[in-house]
A protein has these predicted regions:
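Glycine-rich anion/phosphate-binding loop at the beta-strand->alpha-helix junction
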Residues: 13-20, 135, 210-300
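Acidic, glycine-rich active-site loops and adjacent beta-strand->loop/helix elements
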Residues: 17-18, 30-31, 46, 86-88, ...
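N-terminal, positively charged regions that mediate nucleic acid binding
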Residues: 1-58
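Glycine-rich, N-terminal phosphate-binding loop and its surrounding beta-alpha-beta segment
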Residues: 43-109
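Glycine-rich, mobile lid/loop segments that gate access to catalytic sites or pores
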Residues: 113-233
Length: 300
């Protein structure tokens, strides 16, 4: 069972939903990189459930403990160990379903692979709870990227039949304003159109009250990434980003830029023509999501 992602910068995760703790080991960070624990806590708070009927009813403190690799607010250059204690565990709630195969869950596949030795409590290692370790490790890296002028922002594209305003991918200035608006939000319910918030929340709560759930899409933009980052073919930007994205439980599809919409375009419509603007090369449109040949071209 391999639980490590990355090579030059690698994150190894550990833990189970109802175990004593979950966490990760982040290896490859250079020495002397500032680590803001308040920023990490803010990222964790955006992920954390609030018992408001919009996500899991399980509420955890999600306090990240930095066990190694950080001294006096800076990385030491050695592995950074992060741990989050599990406090709200009620394994007895799963006793009646211990021998049932829940649809849409990894109960059967985990049994087939681990022959019954897997920790099935709360989904064990397959639980969405483990994404807290991804957020903790990601927050350390996100802070470093932010100081390098690279911002990553995400909003809810569509959920429960309610759509948000899409990113202005062809207009870097407008996209920058959208990014600032999202970064200024203090909660984890990221929307660009405030009028979509209440209808979306109402639909989510209605499904929960009926014992059901809803699906959705997220839209992410990376701003400030210079041209020339990535590799062709097997280690392309798309390959690496998709690899990590599919590590999040329940993710079943991903597209870059116009994505599957290319099926309805002609080549002349899909091409992103290059031009000069402000002394730098940009593209007139951004159907390809700032990526050509697996390598960034400087567009979002």
């Amino acid at each position: 069972m391999k639980n490590t992602f990355g090579s030059a910068l690698a994150l190894t995760i550990f833990g189970e939903s109802h175990g004593r703790a979950i966490g990760g080991v982040l290896d490859g960070m250079a020495a002397g990189v500032p680590v803001d624990e308040e920023f990490i806590a803010a990222c964790m708070d955006k992920r954390r459930a609030r018992g408001d009927g919009l996500s899991t009813p399980r509420v955890e403190a999600d306090k990240v403990q930095l066990l190694s690799g950080v001294v006096n607010g800076h990385t030491t250059g050695t592995a950074i160990a992060l741990m989050i204690e599990n406090q709200n565990t009620r394994s007895g709630d799963y006793a009646k379903t211990a021998d049932l195969l829940r649809p849409g869950h990894a109960d059967y596949t985990a049994y087939a692979k681990y022959h019954g030795f897997q920790d099935a409590r709360g989904g064990g290692h397959f639980s969405g709870r483990i994404t807290a370790a991804l957020v903790a490790g990601g927050a350390v890296v996100l802070g470093a990227l932010d100081r390098a002028g690279i911002n990553i922002v995400t909003h809810i594209g569509r959920c429960a039949g309610v759509a948000d305003t899409p990113f202005a991918l062809d207009d870097p200035a407008a996209l920058g304003a959208q990014a600032e608006a999202l970064l200024s939000r203090g909660d984890g319910f990221a929307l660009l159109n405030g009028e979509a918030e209440e209808p979306m929340k109402a639909a989510i709560r209605a499904a929960g009250s009926a014992g059901d759930s809803v699906g959705g899409t997220l839209e992410t933009a990376i701003l400030g990434l210079p041209a020339g980052v990535g590799e062709p073919y097997f280690d392309s930007m798309e390959s690496e980003l998709a690899h990590m994205a599919f590590s999040v439980p329940a993710v079943k599809g991903i597209e870059f830029g116009t994505g599957f919409g290319f099926a309805d375009l002609k080549g002349s419509e899909a091409n992103d023509a290059f031009r000069m603007q402000g002394g730098r090369i940009v593209t007139a449109t951004n159907h390809n999501a700032g990526l050509n040949g697996g390598i960034s071209n400087g567009m979002p």
